[in-house]
From Swiss-Prot:
Enzyme class at the top of the EC tree: oxidoreductase
Record InterPro entries: AA9, AA9_LPMO
Family, per entry: Belongs to the polysaccharide monooxygenase AA9 family.
Record has Isomerase as a keyword: no
GO molecular function, a single term: monooxygenase activity
Cofactor: binding details: Binds 1 copper ion per subunit.
Lineage of producing organism: Eukaryota, Fungi, Dikarya, Basidiomycota, Agaricomycotina
Binding site for Cu(2+): H20, H100, Y182
EC annotation from Swiss-Prot or TrEMBL: 1.14.99.56
KW Disulfide bond (keyword) present: yes
Identification of the protein by name: AA9 family lytic polysaccharide monooxygenase A
Biotechnology: Lignocellulose is the most abundant polymeric composite on Earth and is a recalcitrant but promising renewable substrate for industrial biotechnology applications. Together with cellobiose dehydrogenases (CDHs) an enzymatic system capable of oxidative cellulose cleavage is formed, which increases the efficiency of cellulases and put LPMOs at focus of biofuel research.
Species per Swiss-Prot/TrEMBL record: Schizophyllum commune (strain H4-8 / FGSC 9210) (Split gill fungus)
Length: 247
């Protein structure tokens, strides 16, 4: 009986460990922009998370050798709604394991990706008692952000999931565990010419998150679960010129 129980737990762990995710493509004002993998999404080679907070992959979930411009860009204007569509292995599949509770955030940068400004953030909703990832799954893998009224030009959008199912301990203390970060960068061109330039004091990836950053270490499981209502999303506050987003 003990052996069977152990096998069941092991099977659950294996299934959970493989239930990773990345961005497939985006919509602009509800219109699908075509498959983005390696086209306008700087797609990572796998759907694996980034756990080392000092890794260059914290920027776009690609290593230095793959961090280059892909051939296309998505045209948007200030005030447009851009929706990201995540997937696991195939479009419209299970998106991500239901155990991977955590926040979803979006950052914006100039095309060089040197510094990043947070333009949307969603963590734990006390009204519905759900995490942003829970609602992402219910929404078929889609969440949205409103493009700020920035000057015309080329930009990067960095959508991010931080899965907390193993975040009870820091990765550098136990590399088997630690928060699982899923960043994904989409290339856009803003065609309108707004007046709200991105602030010069954005954060850097890697560097924005450390083990001491609130929201990186957080225990969501009993018997020592922390109250999710106290959860603080990692990183800076959302830019006050950003209209925000939704899941």
């Amino acid at each position: 009986m003990v052996r069977l129980a152990s096998l069941a737990v092991l099977g659950s762990v294996i299934a959970t460990a493989s239930a990773h995710t990345r961005v497939w493509g985006v919509y602009v004002n509800g219109e699908y922009q075509g498959d983005g993998i390696g086209q306008y999404v700087r797609s990572p080679p796998t759907n694996n998370p980034v756990k080392d907070l000092t890794s260059a992959a914290m920027k776009c979930n690609v290593n230095d050798a793959r961090e280059f411009e892909v051939p296309k860009r998505v045209s948007v204007a200030g005030g447009d709604e851009l929706s990201f569509e995540w997937y696991h292995d195939y479009r419209n599949d299970d998106i991500i394991a239901s155990s991977h509770h955590g926040p979803i955030q979006v950052y914006m940068s100039g095309d060089d990706g040197a510094t990043w400004t947070k333009i949307a953030s969603d963590g734990y909703d006390t009204g519905s008692s759900t995490w942003a990832v829970d609602r992402l799954i219910s929404a078929g893998g889609k969440h949205s952000v409103i493009i700020p009224d920035v000057p015309a030009g080329d930009y990067l959008l960095r959508a991010e999931i931080v899965a907390l199912h193993e975040a009870d301990v820091a990765y550098d203390q136990n590399p088997i565990r630690g928060a699982q970060n899923y960043p994904s960068c989409t290339q856009i061109t803003v065609t309108s010419n707004g007046s709200d330039a991105l602030p010069a004091d954005g954060v850097k990836f890697p560097g924005a998150y450390t083990d001491s950053t609130p929201g990186i270490i957080f225990n969501i499981w009993p018997p020592n679960a922390q109250d999710p209502a106290t959860y603080q999303v990692p990183g800076p506050a959302v830019w006050d010129k950003a209209p925000g987003g939704s899941v």
